[in-house]
Each structure stands twice: as structure tokens, then as C-alpha cells.
Amino acid sequence: EAPMRFTVPPEALGSARFRDAHGVRYAYAAGAMYKGIASVDLVTAMGRAGLLSFFGTGGLGLDTIDDALTRIRRALDQGQPFGVNLLSNPQEPDLEMRTVELYLRHGVRTVEASAYIRPTLPLVRYRLAGLSRDAAGNVVQGHHIVAKVSRAEVAERFLRPAPPELVRELVERGLVTAEQAELGARLPLAQDLCVEADSAGHTDGGNAYVLMPAMRALRDRIGEEERYPEPVRLGAAGGIGTPEAALAAFTLGADFIVTGSINQCTVEAGTSDAVKDILQELGVHDTDYAPAGDMFEVGAKVQAVRKGLFFPARAQKLYELYLRHDSLDDLDARTRATLEEKFFRRSIDEVWAETRAHVARRFPERLAEIERSPKQKMALVFRWYFVHSTRLAMAGSAEQRVDYQIHCGPAMGAFNAWVRETPLEKWRERRVVAVAEHLLRETAALLGQQLRMYGSHA
């Protein structure tokens, strides 16, 4: 009997609905990386290849984002796919609204919503402002939200329609129409939900094998309750750097996959060559968890490179000092000297002066309260190190290389091992589109191989 033959094209992986909705060739996206590491060059390269990626807006000013969007739209002037990151900003809701207004002016069709605990007025405005009916009366969803979630209670808020109280406020303020509000009441806030397992950067350390089945069940239950015309699409992110990992994600029911760490080590990534040299040499055990600078006081974690770097250990030391002491004056002379000579490379007074100037510029209403609170002042001085360590890495600074903060997950090491002794071994040969196509091509080949193996036992 002739052997069964299974050939799976990479275009067949994942959901056809995802490909159609976003106008892309593959059920794949390159996720946003903050401070423009997911750069204009990266986004335009992906768009020209018919692939989705998200420009990384975290930590960038509105003028910088405006300029980047102008350049992306100029390069992708035939309607090619691209998206932009939209970060929850509870400290500055007005800035979040101005960011959404900027996206609306630029005609951004897709956003990756990150760090949201619950829907906000700007996010709901973005979703509803894209809703309309065509000549035949069908609902047109002009704006897509890809919501990154790692917890079921947050996922549920995106799987439900937009909160009625936020919708009412938007209508009353004339920011969306009554028809858009009515259409939005029948649709989920996000049509794409990206389930984020243990990942680079901010992470809850989730396990994809646990999260994906739970999120699928939640998606199906809410879809039935709300009587949606079609199910919300589920994506998988975190830990995807090899064909085996990608195939596992699709097997768990992912409609699409999102990669991150592996794209930071490509020619187009907007970080320094020094960082890419480090990333290229990583193994699967060369990352660690460290306190997150932007959520320092609450002990949130990021995953970052450990190999050859002191950042994770020094960040943890600063957090422990914060927990043990009530003010900078409580630090003993030896600890203070260590911070000034090794961590900061400048005096604590200099760090505070720089930090105070930043607060006075961005949050003048909070300055007096901070100066009255020694604990808050200490937290801000320690948080300066996290900002500084990111700047060092992105600039490729030679003199403080050990303090680089490089967000990265073990997918990077897995990818490096997979491409060893191939043309993609060196990062200067790694183009973001080539990485995507190689990964998906080999994932499809692996699926075909497994189908043949199982077919032979049928």
C-alpha cells in the first residue's frame, strides 16, 4: 500500500478568518516591543511581505509616534497590513486619549492593547469609532483590537461587549455615534485575544498548556451567552521560537501566533548592535526574572537577559532595599557607596536632581507629595536605575555593559539552538520576514511529518 502523503502549506496554519480580517498571508504577527524596538523598519518590512506586526510605542512621546506613523503609512501606501501598540495608561488617561486620537487621524486599523486590567474610555472609543454598516446593512468592523491577556478575569472583559457606562459617556461627549454604540453592544470589545504565556518583559509566568484550554473554554462560554455571530479568535504568545513551539500553540487551538524575543535579534530591530550580539549567543537558561521598573513598588516582574549581565541581580537588590528601608537616609554608608559607585555611577543626589526635574516636567501636581514622602522619593531614585539600564542597552554603551536591561524570554535561546550552523546563525543574516517565513515553513513541514507518522498507524 502506498504511504499516505500529507503536505501542509504554511498559509494553512491557524485561522483563515484571522488572515482575511487582517489581510495577511499567515496567521502570524510580530508583537510590539517598547521604545520602538519593534521599529518602523521592522513594521514596514513585515507589511511589504503581507505580514502583520506592531510598532512598539511604549515609552515614546506623541511627536515620535506621529513621525513613525507618517513614515510607516508612506512606506505602506497600498493598504498593506500594520498595527500599533496601545498601552494602558492609568496614570495619564488624557495621554491615552490623545494617543487614540492620533491613531484615528492616521487611520490605524489595528492596535495591540497591552497592560490593560479593564477597558478604558480611549480603548472603547477606538473600537466603536471603526464600526459602520455597508450598503447591504452588514456590520463593518474597521478597527481591530488584538488584546494581550494572561489572566482569565481580564480576558473576560475583552470577550464581552464594551462596558455600557463607557459607551454612554462616549455618546454623550459626541465621540461616537448612537449607531456605533448600538453596533458595539452586539460585538466583543476585542475580536482577537492574544493569550500571553511566560514571555519577555512584563510577565505573569503563565503556562501555555494551562492557559490556552482555559481561555478557549471561556471564549466559547461567553460567545454562547452573548450570541456572537462568530467566535473571538485566540492567539498564543510567549516562548515561541521553534517549529515545535509554534506547532504546539496551533495544536492547543491558537488561531494565530505572536512572536517577540526572536524579532529583537534581527537586522530591523530598533536596538543596538551590542544587544543583538548578546542575544545571538543566548541559550535557553540565560534569562531571569527581575523587578519591573514601571511597577517597582508592587513587585511586578519582567524577564530579562542574565548571561554576562548584572541587571537582574542589581534590580532585585534595589527592590529588597526598598522593602527594608523607609528612606534613603536609612541606608548605611557602605550600601550607599555601592549604589553610587557600581549601580548608578554617580551620586544619589545627582540621580534625585535628574528624577526631580522629570517629575516636575511630567507630573508637577505630584511633586510636593513626593518630596514629603521619603519612601516615595527612595522608590523614584531606585526606579531611575531601570530607565538608565534600558538607555544603556539601546545605545550600546560600552562602559556600563553589565547594567544593560534587555527584555528577553527563553524563546531566544531555543531559536539560536535551532538555527545553529544555518544561514540564520548570525543576527546580521536575520531579517524579520525571513525569520517569520522560516519558522512557519518548518512548522508546516513538522505538521506534515507528524500527520504522515500518525497516518501510517491508522
Regions found by a protein language model. Give the residues of each.
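Phosphate/diphosphate-binding loops
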Residues: 99, 103-114, 285-309
